[in-house]
Amino acid sequence: MQFTDEYSKKTDRLKSLIENADAIVIGAGAGLSTAAGFTYSGQRFHENFHDFEVKYNFHDMYSGGFYPYDTPEEFWAYWSRYILINRYYDPPKPVYNELFELVKDKNYFVITTNVDHCFQKAGFNKQRLFYTQGDYGLFQCSVPCHNKTYDNEE
């Protein structure tokens, strides 16, 4: 990939700042997962949710998450597949792995709205992550009378 001189200067400066930092706080949102290939519309949606697209006439995963399904079975059919591909499949591009390589030997902490588990899959320490919106891989009862969560992979 070829970059402009100005872009190269900025990335070199950023790399230098990271190398010389005592600590790093990373703030990340949906754009990072999108850059890693976790898109919620287009070809990825069509390949994984074509049956829902035809039956319910929505055209992206986000809309499907708010669709008023007639039955709990339809709701969970959608959400179980959604969680499978957005939590348990690896992202197509190594964006998170590359970010981890930049900070792995640093005192880092991550604050993220991403619920797709990509940080942990790339090697980030769970104790250094704060998921403000949770994790697709964990369930909690609908009347949270305790703080226990349940792994949903199986």
Region spans (language model):
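Conserved catalytic core of sirtuin-type NAD+-dependent deacylases
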Residues: 1-154
